[in-house]
């Protein structure tokens, strides 16, 4: 894709993500939050869908910053959306404009929209702070930060965080009460994060 197509694709991603977050009660969202949620969406996609190519891998290029993962194109997409009156900016962050109308040129992958809905569900349950704490404990992110290096974070199948999450996957699935019941993405991630937050974020062994 050329630069214009990339901007339009990310503009649509951000707009749809913001609409989803608005529907679960968010009044506004900061640029750092958008970067973080899309980053964790990308990482968890490979964890949950190990046999599929990551739908974010070719589109997003995150670098390490002190405020979290950042894709510089996201800022351009926000400017594009704001200039077309699709979103509005305030001191609290960005929000979807009333009666926003915008004609997107990119071909949107419905899997991405559905995945954003699943991730927003998890963020809605556990809250921003806990999810963001998880990001800052993200092995891929911490390795880059501690190495004092600026480089593109790996969001594909070989991501260090995916390997970290997979190391707990077998033990987690053994604890599921109804192993024969197929869990949808939301329920699986909800139970998995409950397990991970207990084992990792509270320092339990």
Stretches with model-predicted labels:
Residues 1-205:
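Domain-edge interaction signal
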């Amino acid at each position: 894709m050329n630069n214009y197509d990339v901007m339009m694709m990310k503009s649509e991603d951000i707009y749809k993500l913001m609409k989803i977050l608005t529907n679960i009660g968010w009044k506004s969202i900061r640029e750092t939050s958008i970067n973080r949620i899309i980053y964790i969406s990308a990482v968890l996609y490979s964890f949950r869908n190990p046999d599929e190519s990551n739908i974010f891998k070719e589109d997003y290029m995150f670098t390490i910053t002190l405020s979290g993962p950042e894709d510089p194109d996201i800022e351009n997409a926000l400017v594009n959306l704001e200039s077309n009156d699709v979103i509005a900016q305030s001191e609290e962050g960005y929000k979807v404009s009333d009666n926003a109308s915008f004609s997107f040129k990119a071909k949107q992958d419905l899997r991405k929209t559905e995945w954003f809905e699943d991730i927003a569900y998890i963020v809605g349950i556990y809250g921003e702070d806990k999810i963001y704490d998880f990001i800052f404990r993200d092995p891929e992110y911490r390795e880059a930060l501690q190495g004092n290096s600026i480089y593109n974070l790996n969001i594909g199948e070989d991501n260090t965080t995916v390997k970290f999450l997979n190391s707990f996957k077998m033990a987690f699935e053994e604890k599921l009460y109804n192993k024969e019941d197929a869990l949808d993405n939301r329920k699986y991630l909800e139970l998995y994060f409950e397990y991970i937050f207990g084992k990792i974020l509270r320092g339990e062994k």
